Amino acid sequence: MSTETELQVAVKTSAKKDSRKKGQDRSEATLIKRFKGEGVRYKAKLIGIDEVSAARGDKLCQDSMMKLKGVVAGARSKGEHKQKIFLTISFGGIKIFDEKTGALQHHHAVHEISYIAKDITDHRAFGYVCGKEGNHRFVAIKTAQAAEPVILDLRDLFQLIYELKQREELEKKAQKDKQCEQAVYQTILEEDVEDPVYQYIVFEAGHEPIRDPETEENIYQVPTSQKKEGVYDVPKSQPNSQPLEDFESRFAAATPNRNLSMDFDELLEATKVSAVTQLELFGDMSTPPDITSPPTPATPGDAFLPSSSQTLPGSADVFGSMSFGTAAVPSGYVAMGAVLPSFWGQQPLVQQQIAMGAQPPVAQVIPGAQPIAWGQPGLFPATQQAWPTVAGQFPPAAFMPTQTVMPLAAAMFQGPLTPLATVPGTNDSARSSPQSDKPRQKMGKESFKDFQMVQPPPVPSRKPDQPSLTCTSEAFSSYFNKVGVAQDTDDCDDFDISQLNLTPVTSTTPSTNSPPTPAPRQSSPSKSSASHVSDPTADDIFEEGFESPSKSEEQEAPDGSQASSTSDPFGEPSGEPSGDNISPQDGS
């Protein structure tokens, strides 16, 4: 019976110890609760305190422990015993109290404890190193029971304090950063919010663009506020063919006084036939400058040149009633590149005789495919000054400087005197105007009836292959078959006067090379179909320009009143007749 009772007591005691070991929770919350306040209390005896040289070291602690035990052994031989104490472990550190009096003997904070060591010879003894730099001491303690639980509590305490300190520092740092951000934001808000710098930094994400991109003008365009008459915006895209609406609006902007219903068809036809090339942009080199054409839209080629109407305003009384006088002719003295067929056409010889004695002023260069406003006879008021138009006073060397500056490409009209390949074109304005049929038939049959051509001397540089001029009319081809090929680069007028036989021919039969059908209107701006409609006698004047001087002398008497009224501003003798002064009634 007694044996069973002893066994039951032993089982209960062991169970309590096991449950105490298994049930010990070392979580953070439990440890905080454990070391809060007075902390954990242990009964022990103080072995002694010894000064050491370093803050860490296991050998250092073991040597100090053996030294203190030797001191205690000598005192015990004298009958002295170790001091009984109890120590507490808390967040405040290690505190040692006297068991009898309860007085605080020693207090060492956690940050002062630098090393903890266990005695390798006695499981109930341990020690720790405490103190500040230069004053380190080793405290040796012998516990009532095993020293391992005390050492574990000290380890947990140090680990918990370290983690709490790290977390506190992180929280402080985060709080400090947040406070700094809040302070900066508050400073920005307190400052002038209208400052564009702060707007860009703080409020950039919520703002829309100041200007709508669709309303912004293209950087390659001429600003609308700086637009002038004849200056156009650069289109954003370059289509192959311009729409008719865009063409009509540009033409109306350049020529506000033109009648679009009359001239839109012919200008549209000219635009279709004449392609925009580098050579066409600078016009014809062998054609005299225009003296009556209205100002044309500004282009990169003639933006620095004055308009022809401003240069020579006093010539409308001589050529105002003539159809060829109102046609704008590109200048040949600033032009570059080869002559294209679309700029020749049915050019009368009368215009080649305009420049007398001196080089005329340079007019603007007319681009090839830009719609040009060709002046009507009544658009410009008559003035008091006129050009001398005496045909016999044209100096051959008037245009000699153009030989070295901008030579004419003679290959455009080289080759034997063979009929040029022509492509008949359609003319809506001429088809709709029956008044122009009769003058055109007469021009095709009788324009060259009083001339005979002398075979020009062979030119070595000419090639056997004659280029085909697809943009010329039949009258243009017959014109060159009768008169000759284009002049070489040495001369800037169309023909060499010395090579023409001016002997009149009595035969009135039309040339076999001249086609009987009406010649279609060419794409050259030298003469438009509107000129035929406005003045049917222009073809008669065109015929008179090719007549011999003898015939002109015969007609000088009826036209004496008109010739005498025309003054000669260049001081040239006005006794010789001119093809421009011939009356249209005589030509018919």
Swiss-Prot record:
From which domain of life does this come?
Eukaryota
Which keywords describe this protein according to UniProt?
A: Cytoplasm, Developmental protein, Differentiation, Neurogenesis, Phosphoprotein, Ubl conjugation
Q: Point to the regions of Low complexity compositional bias.
A: 503-512, 523-534
Record function comment? Signaling adapter of the reelin-mediated signaling pathway, which regulates the migration and differentiation of postmitotic neurons during brain development. Mediates intracellular transduction of Reelin signaling following reelin (RELN)-binding to its receptor: acts by docking proteins through its phosphotyrosine residues and PID domain.
Record's subunit section: Associates with the SH2 domains of SRC, FYN and ABL. Interacts (phosphorylated on tyrosine residues) with CRK and CRKL (via respective SH2 domain). Interacts with SIAH1, LRP8 and VLDLR. Interacts with LRP1. Interacts with APLP1 (via NPXY motif). Interacts with DAB2IP. Interacts with ZSWIM8.
Q: Where is this region: Disordered?
A: 1-26, 224-243, 420-444, 451-470, 502-588
Cite the GO molecular-function annotations of the record. phospholipid binding; SH2 domain binding; signaling adaptor activity
Q: Return the Acidic residues bias intervals.
A: 537-546
Report the residues modified as Phosphotyrosine.
Answer: Y198, Y220, Y232
Q: Name one GO biological process term.
A: small GTPase-mediated signal transduction
Record's subcellular location: Cytoplasm
Its UniProt domain note says:
The PID domain specifically binds to the Asn-Pro-Xaa-Tyr(P) motif found in many tyrosine-phosphorylated proteins.
Expression tissues: Expressed mainly in brain. Specifically expressin in cortical neurons.
Species the sequence originates in: Mus musculus (Mouse)
Report biased composition (Basic and acidic residues) as residue ranges. 15-26
Report what the protein is called.
Answer: Disabled homolog 1
Tell me which PANTHER family the record gives. DISABLED HOMOLOG 1, PID DOMAIN-CONTAINING PROTEIN
Span of domain PID: 36-189
- Principal subcellular localization: cytoplasm
Q: How is it modified after translation?
A: Phosphorylated by FYN on Tyr-198 and Tyr-220 upon reelin induction in embryonic neurons. Also found phosphorylated on Tyr-232 upon reelin induction. Also phosphorylated on Ser-524 independently of reelin signaling.
Q: In the UniProt annotation, what is the result of changing Y220F?
A: Reduces phosphorylation by SRC or downstream kinase. Abolishes phosphorylation by SRC or downstream kinase. Abolishes interaction with CRKL SH2 domain
Pfam families per the record? DAB2_SBM, PID
